[in-house]
């Protein structure tokens, strides 16, 4: 989707004030409330990977999926800049088939509105 090219470029700037850390802590709290053994998360619609990086800081292994190559490229750059070991993949979440099991999946922000 070509529309995401410019959006990806400005995404981090648009959401510079977004509190990803608190959102990740909220997600973690919800996951722990229902299952304390969750350690692997797949994030559908990861965008530039900010939630994934914050979740990794909380001890989770994350795999970020987004349909935009531009978003994934920036997510990889962001993770590398912060020294984070996160896997990011380009895929359409409607057709994605995971090659391994995950303990939980998340889809944050307004991902479904793009489908």
What does each model-found stretch correspond to?
Residues 41, 105:
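Receiver (REC) domain switch-region micro-motif
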Residues 42, 49-95:
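Class I SAM-dependent methyltransferase SAM/SAH-binding core
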Residues 36-39, 84, 100:
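Structured loop/turn residues at beta-strand edges in well-structured enzyme cores
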Residues 1-37:
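Conserved class I S-adenosyl-L-methionine
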Residues 108-110:
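Residues lining the SAM
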Residues 114-115:
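A short, conserved alpha-helix within the catalytic core of class I
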Residues 97-104:
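A short acidic, Gly/Pro-enriched loop at the edge of an enzyme's catalytic core
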């Amino acid at each position: 989707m070509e529309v995401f090219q410019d959006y990806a470029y400005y995404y981090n700037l648009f959401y510079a004030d977004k509190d990803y850390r608190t959102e990740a802590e909220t997600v973690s709290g919800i996951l722990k409330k229902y299952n304390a053994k969750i350690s692997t998360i797949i994030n559908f619609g990861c965008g530039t990977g900010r939630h994934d990086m914050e979740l990794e800081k909380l001890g989770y292994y994350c795999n970020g999926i987004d349909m935009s190559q531009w978003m994934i490229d920036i997510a990889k750059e962001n993770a590398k800049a912060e020294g984070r070991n996160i896997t990011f993949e380009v895929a359409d979440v409607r057709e994605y088939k995971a090659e391994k099991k995950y303990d939980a999946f998340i889809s944050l922000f307004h991902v479904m509105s793009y489908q």
